[in-house]
């Protein structure tokens, strides 16, 4: 289903810029001023131009760091044969989130969004493929992960089936809503173990690299969305994700992971 969605995204991109195009093409003289400022010339880059260039460029790195963050832990768990306190639900949701954003980036022809999700797509698929056998038949999150994977795939198929009958101008908007909703669920998913964290006063189930990557990534994309792109599909879900990431970080500080 993910491959079908990507093929449709590339084919359904509207001939004219969509209603929510992230960044209108800059005039030639504006581009020249930006290049001159970057090379140390006399022209000065405005704050909006700086945010529009550096924030998404760094966001490409932090987005992929977010998607790659769980892979080392899962590979280490494969060697030991046990996932331990690792929460597998966020890694499952990441599959649908990365493909949702990748489809949105293709639909609105935004290279920043495509670059920030394309490498991560391989990482989340590898993480899930390694993680699933380690869960066995007795892992408490097995049913939730299976339901999330199948349910997300069916939701993606239903979305793209509906887009065939939607107007061209509405397609990018609908994909944006879909990707945003999944990302908010992803950002909140580490808190699925909050009851365990509070009862045991141990935040081991909240994976620190994922939390740090989420905070850095959502901060950069929120700044880019507000200052440069002015796109609610960028700053909306990322702003919510930043707040949820800070909650996770607070729990990590209040209830440190116990040494094992």
Where are these regions (language model features)?
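N-terminal chloroplast transit peptides
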Residues: 1-24
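Alpha-helical membrane-protein topology signature
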Residues: 34-260
């Amino acid at each position: 289903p993910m491959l079908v969605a990507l093929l449709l995204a590339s084919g359904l991109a509207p001939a004219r810029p969509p209603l929510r195009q992230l960044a209108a093409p800059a005039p030639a003289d504006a581009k020249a001023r930006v290049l001159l400022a970057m090379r140390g010339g006399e022209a000065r880059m405005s704050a909006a131009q700086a945010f529009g260039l550096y924030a998404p460029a760094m966001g490409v790195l932090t987005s992929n760091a977010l998607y790659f963050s769980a892979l080392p832990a899962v590979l280490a768990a494969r060697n030991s044969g046990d996932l331990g306190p690792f929460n597998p639900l966020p890694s499952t949701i990441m599959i649908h989130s990365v493909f949702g954003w990748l489809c949105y980036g293709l639909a609105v022809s935004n290279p920043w969004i495509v670059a920030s999700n394309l490498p991560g797509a391989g990482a989340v698929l590898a993480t899930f493929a390694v993680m699933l056998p380690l869960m066995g038949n007795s892992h408490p999150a097995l049913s939730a992960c299976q339901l999330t994977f199948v349910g997300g795939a069916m939701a993606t198929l239903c979305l793209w089936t509906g887009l065939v009958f939607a107007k061209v101008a509405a397609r990018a908007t609908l994909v944006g809503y879909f990707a945003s909703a999944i990302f908010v669920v992803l950002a909140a998913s580490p808190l699925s173990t909050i009851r365990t964290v509070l009862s045991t006063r141990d935040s081991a189930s909240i994976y620190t690299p994922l939390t740090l990557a989420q905070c850095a990534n959502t901060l950069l994309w929120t700044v880019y969305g507000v200052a440069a792109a002015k796109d609610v599909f960028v700053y909306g879900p990322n702003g919510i994700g930043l707040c949820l990431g800070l909650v996770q970080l607070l729990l990590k500080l209040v209830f440190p992971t116990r040494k094992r």
